From Swiss-Prot:
Biological process annotations from GO: biosynthetic process
Keyword Oxidoreductase part of the UniProt annotation: no
Name assigned to this protein: GTP cyclohydrolase III
Source organism superkingdom: Archaea
Its job: Catalyzes the formation of 2-amino-5-formylamino-6-ribofuranosylamino-4(3H)-pyrimidinone ribonucleotide monophosphate and inorganic phosphate from GTP. Also has an independent pyrophosphate phosphohydrolase activity.
Gene3D superfamilies in the record: 3.30.70.270, Nucleotide cyclase
Reactions accelerated catalytically: GTP + 3 H2O = 2-amino-5-formylamino-6-(5-phospho-D-ribosylamino)pyrimidin-4(3H)-one + 2 phosphate + 2 H(+)
Gene name as annotated: gch3
Enzyme class: hydrolase
Record lineage: Archaea, Thermoproteota, Thermoprotei, Thermoproteales, Thermoproteaceae
């Protein structure tokens, strides 16, 4: 089983509205701090976190003790202007674990499987068409992956640039993803007991594909 934590900021919208109309620069500064704190404290326990919205985040927490997750959330609270809540779900896929959040927080003892994906030759495309073109392509890919992941049981997350992370149920799902996205991609896949270790392996696999000029999927266990 896979295990996913969902972190939410209670009353965040009301807090933003309390700042008045000249507020966006304050909101963006706070959100940057929240993003930094989320990554610092969750990766320090071996989890893989990411914001879905800045008032909510998900984290793959396979094989991470609940006590450590609680400590990470407690540290995140110090960066938040509002109360922080979380729940944990388990399921046969990361997506199903996300959907079951709060219902049954089992052990989540499956090995974590993560992908690190990027577009092929995005630097050339950016030079030719500008960064907005690539950004819109990535948004299109994320949208396509959102629908595909509902069937495969994965969760796709935008990392910035032309990089996407995908929480996978198993390595073979990466091959279908690579086939179905609308542009050529490289997909590094990592498998490990702890999620962040799996993502480090995925990045190593992606770096190998990049350095060897290979398009496709590489799995590192």
């Amino acid at each position: 089983m896979h295990r996913v934590a969902v972190v939410t900021l209670r009353g965040y919208r009301e807090w933003t509205e309390s700042l008045g109309p000249r507020r966006e620069h304050i909101i963006q500064r706070v959100q940057a701090g929240l993003h930094m704190a989320l990554w610092r404290h969750f990766t320090s326990i071996g989890a893989f976190p990411h914001h879905t919205r800045y008032d909510a985040a998900v984290a793959l927490v396979n094989n991470i003790p609940t006590t450590l997750i609680e400590k990470a959330v407690d540290k995140l609270k110090k960066a938040s202007p509002v109360p922080v809540e979380y729940c944990i779900g388990t399921g046969p896929t990361p997506y199903e674990a996300y959907l079951s959040c709060g219902e049954a927080a089992g052990d989540g003892d499956n090995y974590a499987v993560l992908a690190h994906m990027d577009m092929v030759d995005s630097t050339h495309v950016t030079r030719a068409n500008g960064p907005l073109h690539v950004y819109l392509q990535i948004l299109h890919i994320i949208s396509d992956l959102g629908d595909l992941c509902k069937r495969l049981g994965c969760i796709a997350l935008y990392l910035g640039g032309d990089n996407v992370a995908v929480l996978l149920p198993e390595p073979k799902a990466a091959y279908e993803i690579a086939e179905r996205v609308p542009v050529p991609v490289r997909v590094g896949v990592g498998v490990a007991k702890r999620p962040y270790t799996a993502f480090v392996k995925a990045t190593k696999a992606l770096d190998y594909l990049r350095s060897h000029g290979v398009v496709g999927v590489k799995v590192l266990k």
